[in-house]
């Protein structure tokens, strides 16, 4: 195993082998403990219909159901949120995940197109033209604004979908989908998340769907693997301590170095990690 590979695995808390049943039990209890300790009553999560939000959503629903049963407090709830920019190409996938697998207590829909377009227009008027890439990040941050607004009105916490295969590459928007109060998938790689979904009886289409951030209008539904330049199977092998090609290892390690800032709080005068 490469020395840096071992450091990354330890930093992200990845185990080479997991028991899906034990992981589900542990992560549901983690969510329950968080809610009881913080005195919050709700969980809020944007649902895209892909593997990560489907898994985080189902774990969240199981957690609030467990708390209601154990405490008799029916205030505990999970709110699944659809956050389309206009008409989303994968809308049917998202609704399938919500209705057929996650089965949340409450479903909300907030279209972020007007807010996003207004922000872009205002920036253009201020003399700062916005690229399609930057507009994609604005979309991600608008979605998080909505989720925190819903959470604030419902004594709720925002659930993040970050996991080890995403964290190692920093493949998320800083203060967008990277912003959350609790990340129940942390430490899992992509294939381990799939194993949890299979244990939970999820339909195959939820974990076989090609992962995509789908933020750029110039490149709609662009696969994550195309943007990253490395396959998730290679990322998972790397995180599980297996040997991967030198090219794949170097690509993963390059992403990890370049995105360190996303895995830290804002840099303070006494911080040294960035130097």
From Swiss-Prot:
Pathway: Cofactor biosynthesis; NAD(+) biosynthesis; NAD(+) from deamido-NAD(+) (ammonia route): step 1/1. One of its GO terms (cellular component) is cytoplasm. Mg(2+) binds at residues 52, 166. One of its GO terms (molecular function) is NAD+ synthase (glutamine-hydrolyzing) activity. The keyword Cell division does not apply. The keyword Magnesium applies. Belongs to the NAD synthetase family. This is NH(3)-dependent NAD(+) synthetase. It comes from Limosilactobacillus reuteri (strain DSM 20016) (Lactobacillus reuteri).
């Amino acid at each position: 195993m490469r020395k840096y590979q071992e450091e990354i695995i330890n930093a992200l808390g990845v185990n080479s082998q997991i028991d899906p049943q034990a992981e589900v039990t542990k992560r549901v209890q983690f969510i329950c403990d968080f809610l009881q300790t913080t005195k919050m009553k709700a969980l809020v999560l944007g649902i895209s219909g892909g593997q990560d939000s489907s898994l985080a959503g189902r774990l969240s629903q199981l957690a609030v159901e467990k708390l209601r049963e154990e405490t008799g407090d029916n205030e505990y709830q999970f709110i699944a949120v659809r956050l389309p920019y206009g008409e989303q190409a994968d809308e049917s996938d998202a609704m399938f995940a919500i209705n057929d697998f996650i089965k949340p207590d409450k479903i909300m829909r907030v279209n972020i197109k007007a807010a996003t377009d207004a922000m872009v227009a205002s920036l253009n008027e201020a003399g700062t033209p916005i690229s399609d890439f930057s507009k994609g990040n604005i979309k991600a941050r608008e979605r998080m604004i909505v989720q925190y607004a819903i959470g604030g009105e419902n004594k709720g916490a925002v659930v993040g979908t970050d996991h080890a295969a995403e964290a190692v590459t920093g493949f998320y928007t800083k203060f967008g989908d990277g912003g959350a109060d609790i990340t129940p998938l942390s430490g899992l790689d992509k294939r381990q998340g799939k194993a949890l979904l299979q244990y939970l009886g999820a339909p195959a289409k939820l974990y076989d769907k090609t992962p995509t951030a789908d933020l750029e209008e110039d490149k709609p539904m662009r696969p994550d693997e195309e943007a990253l330049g490395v396959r998730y199977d290679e990322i998972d092998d790397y995180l599980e301590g297996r040997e991967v090609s030198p090219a794949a290892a170097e690509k993963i390690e390059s992403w990890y170095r370049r995105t360190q800032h996303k895995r830290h709080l804002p840099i303070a005068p006494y911080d040294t990690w960035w130097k």
